[in-house]
Amino acid sequence: MRKDQFVLLSQNKMIGLFLGDTDFSEIVLSKIKKQKIKYFIIDFSKNNKFNKDKNSFRISIGRFGTIIDLIKQKKCKRVLFAGKISKPKFSSLRLDFKGIYYMPSIIKAAKIGDAAIIKSIIKILNNERIKVISSIFFNPELSLKKGCYTKLKPNKQDLISIKKGKFFFNKTKSLDHIHALV
């Protein structure tokens, strides 16, 4: 257990979970339950996946005021995003006052890409003094350190191919999502 996880556990703080679809959100939730950390869920899944949990709340993405009020009511200082949160149709969103205030920056970010939307939401939460934790904070075993994890070492042609991939990766925008480079 890392030091910052121990501090979070020892202070017995509440953590807010913005959970969407995919198995990753369930993995994060089970890990938090095992560590007996107080939590609440803001459910963004399509089919209300977490409605059986007593700490689950289904709130529309456009209701920033309600979300922020809930976070402050639970005395939560940290939130975590996990799972796939589908992009909403901005024309059909029901907005509250804070939603109306923050929506122009989110729509502007939506024109850039999905990662820009997440960054703008993180910026909004930072303005409200709410810290966003990395999604692998409780599951560090899901990420690997830098290095070669096979017995086979890359040959000269592989190294050239890797160099080309890095070149094309560096040419793309920082907010683009690239799933694979061949």
Predicted segments — roles?
Residues 91-111:
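A charged helix-plus-loop insertion that forms the helical arch/lid used to bind
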Residues 57-71, 111-115:
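Glycine-rich anion/phosphate-binding loops
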Residues 121-134, 143-182:
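Internal active-site segments that recognize and position negatively charged phosphoryl groups
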Residues 43-62:
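N-terminal beta-loop-helix "entrance" segment that forms/cooperates
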Residues 17-19, 41-43, 79-82, 132-136, ...:
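General beta-strand structural signal in soluble alpha/beta enzymes
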Residues 9-42:
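N-terminal basic/disordered segments at the start of proteins
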Residues 84-87:
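Short glycine-rich anion-binding loops that position phosphate/pyrophosphate groups of nucleotides
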